[in-house]
Amino acid sequence: MDMVSPVLNLQSSILGELVGIIGKVFFLLIEEIKYPIITPKIIVDAQISSWSLFFFASICNLSAKFREPIVTTSSIISLMESEKDLKNVNEYFQIMAKMLFILENKIVVSLFVVFNISVLIIVKSEPYSYGKVLFKPSSSIF
């Protein structure tokens, strides 16, 4: 019996829960920022970060449910570190696309594609508006 897989699943599950909590709190804080003094770039970058946190948490939780380490702790940390240097929304999608090479579950991959297409449509339809949160998920997502 291989003991590595349960350990990775436990790590993924715990990290998923922690990242999910951080993402939710961060999103709520960003939702309160509705003043014109905040530049659109800051709002967009902040929303990208909160969506990324939520996405990583979802993948971790799915990984634990399927008892397969779909996303390992190190891959999440490395992607989150690379996210700090984002210049624009396009780079965000490029970094998130790297996740497709890590994922092995077709359901997760299809959800990932639908999620990114919906975010891309929102970004294209409402580019840079002052004091407005661009990505506002429905309460059912959380």
Swiss-Prot record:
Question: Which residue spans traverse the membrane?
Answer: 10-30, 42-62, 102-122
Q: Where in the cell is it found?
A: Membrane
Describe its membrane topology.
Answer: Multi-pass membrane protein
Recorded superkingdom: Eukaryota
Broad class of where this protein is predominantly found: membrane
Q: Which residues lie on this side of the membrane: Extracellular?
A: 31-41, 123-142
The keyword Transcription regulation is annotated on this UniProt entry: no
Q: Which GO terms describe its cellular component?
A: membrane
Which ranges sit in the Cytoplasmic compartment?
1-9, 63-101
Q: Identify the keywords attached in UniProt to this record, alphabetized.
A: Membrane, Transmembrane, Transmembrane helix
Query: Beyond the main fields, what else does the record say?
Result: Partially overlaps YBR063C.
This protein is called: Putative uncharacterized membrane protein YBR064W
Which organism is this entry from? Saccharomyces cerevisiae (strain ATCC 204508 / S288c) (Baker's yeast)
